[in-house]
A protein has these predicted regions:
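Cytoplasmic (intracellular) domains, linkers, and terminal tails of multi-pass ion channels
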Residues: 2-8, 26
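Conserved active-site beta-strand element of glycosyltransferases/polysaccharide synthases
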Residues: 116
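Regulatory nucleotide-sensing modules
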Residues: 11-65
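Cyclic nucleotide-binding regulatory domains
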Residues: 41-110
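A small-molecule sensor/coupling module
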Residues: 95, 102-104, 120-159
């Protein structure tokens, strides 16, 4: 049952949407479904990241703590992940390359949610065995990062 949910979720994920069934198979096999209640934290800013996540059901806010000039902190919503046609990936991208990664924001469930999680170390091993998949994923990452940079620049221009 979980493999069906995982496959359907990964098909909706920006990062994996273009993979064939055969290419997606090793990723489905290592992925897991995690369930959270409203208010649960999936991962926290400043902590070491080890997984990538894709929202299956529910809603998750990405929150960033920001240090203010008076020494206090504020929390800002960076992005809200919803059950859309094309889903964003969240978590620790750099560990796919074997690099340590500290989470740059926190992921908090706004309502009961299910996510598909993948340990980055397992993903890296799967990619190392299948260089063609790795190439497709890294090409997709470049396009996703380009879009996010464009979005960030557009947001800065409104300040």
């Amino acid at each position: 049952m979980d493999s069906k949910v995982i496959r359907e979720t990964l098909r909706k994920c920006q990062l994996f949407a273009g993979l064939s069934d055969e290419e997606l198979k090793p990723i489905v096999e290592l992925a897991r479904v995690e369930e959270y209640k409203a208010g649960d934290i999936i991962y926290e800013q400043g902590h070491f990241g080890t997984k990538l996540y894709c929202l299956s059901k529910g809603q998750v806010s990405l929150l960033r703590r920001i240090g203010l000039s008076d020494g206090t902190t504020a929390t800002s919503t960076v992005y809200i992940l919803r059950e859309t046609r094309l889903r964003r990936i969240m978590g620790c991208w750099c560990t796919l390359l074997g690099e340590d990664h500290i989470q740059m924001c926190s992921a908090k469930c706004d309502k009961p949610s299910k996510v598909v999680s993948m340990a980055c170390s397992d993903l890296k091993k799967a990619f190392d065995k299948n260089p063609g998949i790795q190439t497709k994923i890294l090409e997709k990452f470049i396009l996703i990062l380009r879009d996010r940079l464009e979005s960030s620049y557009a947001a800065l221009e409104t300040l």
